[in-house]
Amino acid sequence: MEAAICELTWHEARNFRKEGDLCLAFGSGKYKFEVVEGWFKPPKGWHFGWIPAVACDLQGRVFVYSRSEHPLVILDSDGNFIDEWGVGILKDAHGIWIDAEGNVYCTERNNHCVFKFNPKGKLVMTLGTPGKPAEREGEPFNAPTDTVTVKPNNGNAPIAALFVSDGYRNFRVHKFTPDGQLIKSWGRQGSGPGEFNLPHCVRVDRYNRVWVCDRENRRIQIFDLEGNYLTEWRNLLRPNSLFFDPHDDVVYIAELEHRVSIWTLDGELIASWGGGKPNERAGEFLGGPHGIWVDAHGNLYVSEVLVNGRIQKFVRV
């Protein structure tokens, strides 16, 4: 499937500015958002490097996963510090996922593993050997990028499973049982169907289709739960991550080339902003959107790489 391309400039994509305050709104139609300036309020004296990933649980907590001395920081919805996890464990943040039970999966790129924490922050499972890449080509893991879970109550999924995109050097997607037993893998380096040039994120929609951000091929590939190729969206701006609206057939995409875009699951672009030059203005993107999540209230969170400590909250209006 050939996805439509947005060519809006920042001035065209911006919908309005509130006089008397500094809120800017972005998007269009049903999907308009105001950026909340100064939302991220870490403890005084804490410094953050790149923030590759962000996620929200059903309690409204926001998990900020960064490459810093405080790798996994938990905030309330107003950006205030609650807790931190993973000090001494998490070494190289990349992707994050929170399942329906509140378990948190942290994918460590150059640590070559996935850590699973329970909702209270206890480490309960490790996939891979921390610090050691796979000994054989194609086996898990060699610079993995992201993780997602699917359970029988997600549509009509026949079994529970866990998928990991792997990643910078393996060009594979792996499917595991919930307790971490490898079921199968697929993919190889290339640009054809089922081939990857950096599988950067993996997610599963409500129709049990596996979506993989094939970043350096500038596309998203879509598979069934067994890894059979279904279709693809081309001509994206190097997609880093995606998130499915839990209430509607809509997908949010974070694209490295300074854009956030919102699409129907049929590939129709319905809103976007950014996509031009780096911009430090609130609501725009200075480094590159890398992590994306929508909370239970429809608020959007976007974290960036290639710049230190940048994460933004957008409130649905």
For the regions a protein language model found, what residue spans apply to each?
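Eukaryotic scaffold repeat domains enriched in small/polar residues
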Residues: 6-8, 13-317
